[in-house]
């Protein structure tokens, strides 16, 4: 197979049952290119937005990995599986009926910075091996507590007895399964999360996501400029460009143009040097894109 050089992003609508790595392999095959990576794991039992970077755009990995996320989740109170999702084995049941008022009363405790222990059935690496693989082998291990931020939790609808629909806006690294397991404990019961849909990941929204079948048909890759079309481009002279390329300090005052408060691209003769922001009155590199 001859490799085709392509660079940009694909906003994939990941189906339930596929791993994020499965999606990457499919994209490589469809686009006939090797340099492909996803921008934040989505659990096999979850579906929704999985941004995938291709070629030069893989340099944005760290940038997107820290961006906020939005999820819709259906939570089943009174039932617990070992993986806290629909793929696991039922390990506990509780007959307690959970009412909307009980849920609403505890939600404020989970807004803001909170600590959570990710589930053992997860892609977190423990001594180089995935936690989920160790869990399947019944190997005992501990996962460290992590701090995440929940911007908003909204109870949208009671679907049926003990089954509710929620919307969550949160920081990267948040485990929705753990969040609702902890909420259930606060109420005095247990829970599992049979449905998780990621509707937004940073700049990528579910409204523009495409299936792998649609990618197969269109081969459409979003260019970097399409994803960042709202960001300003700042043109600099050769001398400043050389200093930036070599990683030397450039003060904001040396650039003869009003610099935005948000991120911006710096270019020289139509060549993009990278994504920058102003920090401590100087240029702070976010993503270096220059290739000699």
Predicted regions mapped to residue ranges:
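Acidic, low-complexity central loop/insert segments
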Residues: 63-118
């Amino acid at each position: 197979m001859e490799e085709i050089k392509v660079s940009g992003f694909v906003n994939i609508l990941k189906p339930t049952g596929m791993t994020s790595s499965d999606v990457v392999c499919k994209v490589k095959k469809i686009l006939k290119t090797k340099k492909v990576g996803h921008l934040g794991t989505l659990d096999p039992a979850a579906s929704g937005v999985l941004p995938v970077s291709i070629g030069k755009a893989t340099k944005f990995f760290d940038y997107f990995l820290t961006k906020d996320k939005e999820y819709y989740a259906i939570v089943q109170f009174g039932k617990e599986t070992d993986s806290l999702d629909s793929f696991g084995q039922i390990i506990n049941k509780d007959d307690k009926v959970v009412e909307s008022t009980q849920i609403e009363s505890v939600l404020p405790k989970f807004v803001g910075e909170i600590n959570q222990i990710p589930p053992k059935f997860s892609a977190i690496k423990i001594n180089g091996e995935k936690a989920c693989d160790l869990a399947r082998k019944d190997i005992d291990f501990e996962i460290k507590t992590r701090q995440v931020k929940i911007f908003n939790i909204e109870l949208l609808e009671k679907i049926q007895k003990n089954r509710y629909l929620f919307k969550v806006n949160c920081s990267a690294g948040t485990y929705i399964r753990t969040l609702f397991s902890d909420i259930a404990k606060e109420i005095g019961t247990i829970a599992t999360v049979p449905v998780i849909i990621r509707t937004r990941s940073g700049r990528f929204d579910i409204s523009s996501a495409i299936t792998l079948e649609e990618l197969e048909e269109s081969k459409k890759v979003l260019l970097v400029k399409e994803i960042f079309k709202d960001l300003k481009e700042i043109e600099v002279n050769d001398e400043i460009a050389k200093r930036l390329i070599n990683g030397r300090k450039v003060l904001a005052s040396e650039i003869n143009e009003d610099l935005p408060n948000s991120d911006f691209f710096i270019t020289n003769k139509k060549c993009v040097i990278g994504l920058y922001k102003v920090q401590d009155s100087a240029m702070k590199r976010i993503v270096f894109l220059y290739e000699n």
